[in-house]
């Protein structure tokens, strides 16, 4: 018979798959909206360029002619933002209810489970730093505002470059919109669509995690902490691999998502029955899924990766880190700092000079 922590670990993995399917459905609706807008943008860009002879080109003139383009783009992204905000608000309500019902159905009836304030959690999700990149992190609401301005600037710059280079109108439009023969995958708009896809997936993961962490905090008396759970496959980032399986106190630790399109999640770690004052057998070690089937829940990413080929190890870690991993038995978590940030090779070399020397690197 499964223990509570075992059941919760299984549920966390299954639930993350459901959230991925949900985010994909939101993405499809957003892309359909943007595709409809892109047709209008193509017509407006063509009309603007036809009214802008190369000999009369000025930045001010271009900006004036692109007013309708900017307006159409702004309206489209207002609709995108509204759709995302509505979906995320509904997601908070769903996730809060899901976690509450999961605990209610999994824990003994003697245990009292607390619910979260959905409005407060949604506000926290919008305000919590979200975009993890070389530029740092910003709150989700600020991230959403920046999407529209970013695409508008790319459109303007592409047109400006084309006019300065003396390119014909159809070539400029193709650069922005893409070509039909390639299903428009070669245009700037496709880049924007991919950006939106990554943002939506990460926003869903971010919002679900904020809801979970707030739920954990409300039920802190029941929990030892929370566990970082990364997907065990060759696409997992070094950052997530280094954190997988680690347990952190409630309210602290590096939380998922760690990067755009992050697939990591979290699971609560219930206190022992003795600590909860309940006379039941202690929880045992659980199991969770990898692409290879069932693996122990206490199996770290390093243990999983050591069973893979050198090519898989190098694909995930890079050639230098892969060699260190194999020859010196360095665990994956040694390639990151305490916050899960990947150390550069120079930083690793300074920190592990002797190991680099032994490996002949």
Model-flagged regions — what are they?
Residues 1-183, 275-361:
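N-terminal leader/targeting and assembly helices and adjacent pre-domain segments
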Residues 173, 183-284:
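Acidic, glycine-rich two-metal-ion catalytic cores of nucleic acid-processing enzymes
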């Amino acid at each position: 018979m499964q223990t509570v922590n075992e059941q919760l670990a299984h549920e966390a993995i299954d639930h993350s798959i459901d959230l991925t399917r949900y985010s994909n459905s939101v993405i499809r609706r957003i892309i359909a909206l943007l595709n409809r807008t892109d047709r209008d943008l193509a017509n407006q860009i063509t009309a603007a360029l036809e009214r802008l002879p190369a000999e009369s080109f000025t930045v001010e003139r271009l900006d004036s002619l692109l007013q309708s383009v900017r307006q159409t783009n702004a309206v489209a992204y207002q609709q995108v933002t509204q759709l995302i905000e509505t979906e995320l608000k509904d997601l908070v309500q769903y996730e809060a209810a899901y976690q509450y019902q999961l605990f209610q159905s999994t824990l003994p009836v003697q245990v009292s489970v607390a619910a979260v304030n959905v409005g407060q959690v949604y506000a926290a999700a919008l305000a919590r730093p979200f975009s993890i990149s070389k530029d740092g992190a910003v709150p989700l609401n600020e991230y959403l505002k920046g999407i529209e301005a970013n695409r508008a600037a790319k459109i303007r710059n592409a047109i400006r470059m084309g006019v300065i280079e003396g390119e014909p109108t159809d070539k400029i439009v193709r650069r922005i919109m893409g070509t039909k023969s390639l299903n428009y995958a070669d245009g700037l708009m496709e880049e924007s669509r991919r950006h939106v896809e990554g943002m939506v997936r990460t926003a869903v993961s971010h919002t679900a995690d904020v809801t979970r962490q707030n739920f954990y905090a409300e039920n802190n008396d029941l929990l030892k902490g929370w566990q970082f759970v990364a997907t065990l496959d060759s696409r997992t980032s070094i950052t997530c691999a280094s954190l997988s399986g680690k347990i952190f106190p409630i309210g602290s630790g590096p939380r998922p998502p760690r990067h755009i399109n992050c697939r990591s999640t979290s699971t609560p770690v219930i206190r022992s029955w003795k600590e909860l004052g309940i006379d039941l057998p202690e929880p045992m070690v659980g199991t969770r899924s990898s692409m290879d089937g069932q693996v122990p829940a206490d199996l770290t990413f390093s243990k999983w990766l050591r069973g893979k080929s050198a090519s898989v190890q190098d694909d995930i870690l890079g050639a230098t880190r892969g060699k260190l991993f194999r020859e010196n038995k360095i665990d994956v978590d040694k390639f990151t700092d305490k916050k899960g940030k990947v150390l550069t090779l120079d930083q690793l070399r300074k920190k592990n000079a002797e190991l680099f020397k032994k490996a002949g690197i």
